[in-house]
Amino acid sequence: MKVLLIKDVKALGKAGEVKEVKDGYGQNFLIAKGFAKAATNEVLKKYESDKKKEAENLRFEIANLEKLKEELSKITLEISKPVGANGSLFGGVTKDEIAHALKEQSHIEIDKKSLECDTFKSLGLHEVSVKLGHAIHAKFNINIKAE
């Protein structure tokens, strides 16, 4: 019997492969446990169709991330913080403050966990890197000013 593997099966193959197996193994184990489906023409066509849709969605998502990367590269956020008598910041600028300023000033929401920077403790222009997903990274600037 031919089966289409839905999940990786040790010593048999990876998800998406069509394998020839004994009827009992296919029916009583692979199909019963949800590791595979019988490889009929309809199942194979649906699998190919789903794979094409998934690839199209991935291309669309990557295109949107590239567009966001381009938008972010043009941004310079302005953040005002109180400073001490010697000109140093009180506490610094955190990822949370950067994410909030990005949302307020540019209407772009980014999770603070995707920001790749430490707390900034000095005034001036700083570069912030953002992990957008699918190995796409963007950079934008923040300008920290005294209040």
From Swiss-Prot:
BP GO terms, sorted: translation
UniProt-recorded Gene Ontology molecular function terms: rRNA binding; structural constituent of ribosome
Record SUPFAM superfamilies: L9 N-domain-like (SSF55658), Ribosomal protein L9 C-domain (SSF55653)
A GO CC term assigned to this protein in UniProt: ribosome
UniProt-listed InterPro entries: Ribosomal_bL9, Ribosomal_bL9/RNase_H1_N, Ribosomal_bL9_bac/chp, Ribosomal_bL9_C, Ribosomal_bL9_C_sf, Ribosomal_bL9_N, Ribosomal_bL9_N_sf
SS bond partners: none
Pfam families: Ribosomal_L9_C, Ribosomal_L9_N
Superkingdom to which the source organism belongs: Bacteria
Record function comment: Binds to the 23S rRNA.
PANTHER family: 50S RIBOSOMAL PROTEIN L9
Family: Belongs to the bacterial ribosomal protein bL9 family.
Annotated protein name in UniProt: Large ribosomal subunit protein bL9
Species this protein is from: Campylobacter jejuni subsp. jejuni serotype O:23/36 (strain 81-176)
Gene: rplI
